[in-house]
Amino acid sequence: MASSVGNVADSTEPTKRMLSFQGLAELAHREYQAGDFEAAERHCMQLWRQEPDNTGVLLLLSSIHFQCRRLDRSAHFSTLAIKQNPLLAEAYSNLGNVYKERGQLQEAIEHYRHALRLKPDFIDGYINLAAALVAAGDMEGAVQAYVSALQYNPDLYCVRSDLGNLLKALGRLEEAKACYLKAIETQPNFAVAWSNLGCVFNAQGEIWLAIHHFEKAVTLDPNFLDAYINLGNVLKEARIFDRAVAAYLRALSLSPNHAVVHGNLACVYYEQGLIDLAIDTYRRAIELQPHFPDAYCNLANALKEKGSVAEAEDCYNTALRLCPTHADSLNNLANIKREQGNIEEAVRLYRKALEVFPEFAAAHSNLASVLQQQGKLQEALMHYKEAIRISPTFADAYSNMGNTLKEMQDVQGALQCYTRAIQINPAFADAHSNLASIHKDSGNIPEAIASYRTALKLKPDFPDAYCNLAHCLQIVCDWTDYDERMKKLVSIVADQLEKNRLPSVHPHHSMLYPLSHGFRKAIAERHGNLCLDKINVLHKPPYEHPKDLKLSDGRLRVGYVSSDFGNHPTSHLMQSIPGMHNPDKFEVFCYALSPDDGTNFRVKVMAEANHFIDLSQIPCNGKAADRIHQDGIHILVNMNGYTKGARNELFALRPAPIQAMWLGYPGTSGALFMDYIITDQETSPAEVAEQYSEKLAYMPHTFFIGDHANMFPHLKKKAVIDFKSNGHIYDNRIVLNGIDLKAFLDSLPDVKIVKMKCPDGGDNADSSNTALNMPVIPMNTIAEAVIEMINRGQIQITINGFSISNGLATTQINNKAATGEEVPRTIIVTTRSQYGLPEDAIVYCNFNQLYKIDPSTLQMWANILKRVPNSVLWLLRFPAVGEPNIQQYAQNMGLPQNRIIFSPVAPKEEHVRRGQLADVCLDTPLCNGHTTGMDVLWAGTPMVTMPGETLASRVAASQLTCLGCLELIAKNRQEYEDIAVKLGTDLEYLKKVRGKVWKQRISSPLFNTKQYTMELERLYLQMWEHYAAGNKPDHMIKPVEVTESA
């Protein structure tokens, strides 16, 4: 405000009076500068009475009245000054100040510009003009005003600092920095410039330089409140919490009632985990500033962290009453609603937060997470991308987007997201865990283990990472601290179930750990409830179901739902069943959850089912369920359970009146929306029915089935070469199979038919015997040619016009057949030498994935090998990284390395065929060989098993019971070892058992797909009749046996 009194020289009074006037004027000016406006006005009025036309006095009076907010009086005296001197720039500037204060910015600017035209070197005029231009939004004009002032006086460091502030606000940080540096060069002790420079460095991410400059500012001015606040803020962001606390406390010593500083200090306490202290400090901030929505929001965060969720919710609501557009409170309240299961309200609040603040990255990410949970993956992806666009270093958004892409089967996209999240935040435990899951699913187990371990180092209390690491270690048979690991895993599950959280152990893995039946069922139940949560948001009314078969012309409509209609073990087992249903009584629908993989398995099911619907083209669960209901399905069969590719949400919507679990998943669904589990008395004894959420529906023999007779008909017969010619015939050293085997054998001279004693299908191998004919080719030139082909690694030779193929080098002709699935068209030779198996040893085998082996199983196997000296164990590199671990543990148990032989995983046909070379299969009690059990039995190899308490541990016993080989089922560990040892040491007994298995696989119901289908139909009809009579689902444990002739 211009307040010059320098016009006294114009006075015509005598010198004495002039001196008196001059002294009074200087006194008034000093009082004005000191802020004693009352005294300054009193003395100025004396001066004005002496010289009413003195423009200096008029200017000072104008300034005094302006400072006292008496704007009209200020304007009056400025106007009087202008009347006295129309060229008085300071008067126009003072009048401009009045207009600016009244909000009349254009009038203010015009007066400032007029002042500067009158006096181009008027520094205060430029400064006042700059302030008015800023208020009017003309930032560039304000910059030019400051620049003009500095052209007249480059040493005005305060002005240069103000120019820097303006440039900083415009985002021109380098220019702002230059201004502050010049101000400091001019006045090195100018604390404000040091603080402002610290703000620029902070904005540029130069945290340490920012800290240095704020500290310099408070050193220069120990009472510089704003600098202490800025220092505290940057230290807080840098997570240097102790020093941040010290800075905020110093600020509070200067201004004890500064609510914002109390709020910021509380934030630091919160980050330090001092929740109670944070709560008290937030409450103090609110006490000082009751209408402080930020403080209420942050207080709510702390209360929520403490577990006071209801009080936190109240605080968020208070913040929103104070400020209905408080985006953080909307977002955080949505988080609470989400955790309470009120998903719709959560979505509404997230959307409201984004309506208020469209660039709110966290709200985009949170909304995306809920949308993902609802199955709205494309919309979720859009919001994650928005979050990342807004905040390119938002590691959580990258990690969560990776989860969505993973669910959409975009593995590479997910991998890139997790990798980027870790690049942004190397200490982001969740991202390391998610990356590990990608490696795990891709079979890169060592990388998965490393990433899970990194996650646990960063976040030791991380149940998901711990349980997934435990599963990875199980896959590769790393049993370091095995017992301790199992105890901790059980403890984690117990704690999660108690707190009603989703357990970190997946239902499909629960069979591998020493969990109680109640825990396993509860784990499945939680996952079933997740499906219900997803479908509840669809608000679909319940479907109305038919009570009779009128609309289907008296036929029962059965729908099989699976993601495995293709080259998958489930299709290998059941591919013929859809086409074997009685078309007069059943109408079969197959609902595929996965795209066509182009294999014959898919083609067969598509061709033989009455209807084949690809639901992978209908990603919306509601619409997919509508399609099933529109088809009028009576019994909907769940073949996935909780395996990869499942869509249990379809079943949660209940599009069919009866819903049953079958074949593809070895356990209970735990879900209220599944009525039955199709099983059998051996697999699921009635006395353990409480292990299942479903009602038990028994098949008369076994619930398991294999389509091996259709897929591998060339293995129905075999011939062997008597390579030793010592009178002892081995049926599994050099084996020939083929569709044209009989014709080939008829072309050979000297083929002997050896009658092998074969027990009938009784309870043991000593029951009445029948003879089994086995063709034996003696050692002659033909046999030698076959052996030479194998030894030289030839692919094929021709004998008597028949092509003879090396079993290790089979080729396929049909491109639509999955690799290794085609039935060989030649005579195929399989030998122990091809796999490095000793010719003169007893070969025990197990072709399961290695995760099914546990320390106690390997110990049993080691005991067996020790008791059968001339024996080896044949395992698969499934995966290869498990081989050295198994070998090391076996050596620790006293077994030389050469007693265990590993082979690579083979294509399906070779895998089944080479099973003929083993003498005995040793099943894994923890989780049996299910499909692999069927494979080895079709090869004619006996399987020793010991049923446990879970469904997964009793399947092999069910298969053997159906086969009529009860003597291979052990009641305990000792009996398991004894049975295996007897088979390995009593060669006559081994022959009898092998002969029995070879015979029974054809004559028993185990591989009789047609009979199985008829029995399954009888069970379906029983379910329907029970439902049609108005009954709720109930156990069906008295199956009706059906013969194929029926």
From Swiss-Prot:
Reactions accelerated catalytically: L-seryl-[protein] + UDP-N-acetyl-alpha-D-glucosamine = 3-O-(N-acetyl-beta-D-glucosaminyl)-L-seryl-[protein] + UDP + H(+); L-threonyl-[protein] + UDP-N-acetyl-alpha-D-glucosamine = 3-O-(N-acetyl-beta-D-glucosaminyl)-L-threonyl-[protein] + UDP + H(+)
Keyword GTP-binding: no
Single GO biological process annotation from the record: protein processing
Motif (DFP motif): 464-466
EC number annotated for this UniProt entry: 2.4.1.255
Tissue and organ distribution: Highly expressed in pancreas and to a lesser extent in skeletal muscle, heart, brain and placenta. Present in trace amounts in lung and liver.
GO cellular component: cell projection; cytosol; glutamatergic synapse; histone acetyltransferase complex; mitochondrial membrane; NSL complex; nucleoplasm; nucleus
Effect of residue 538 to P: Found in a renal cell carcinoma sample; somatic mutation
Keyword Transport: no
Glycan-bearing residues: 3-4, 399
Chief location of this protein within or outside the cell: nucleus
Impact when changing residue 254 to F: In XLID106; decreased protein abundance; reduced protein stability
Modification note: Ubiquitinated by the SCF(FBXO31) complex, leading to its proteasomal degradation. Phosphorylation on Ser-3 or Ser-4 by GSK3-beta positively regulates its activity. Phosphorylation at Thr-454 by AMPK promotes nuclear localization.
Domain notes: The TPR repeat domain is required for substrate binding and oligomerization.
Protein name as catalogued: UDP-N-acetylglucosamine--peptide N-acetylglucosaminyltransferase 110 kDa subunit
Source organism of this protein record: Homo sapiens (Human)
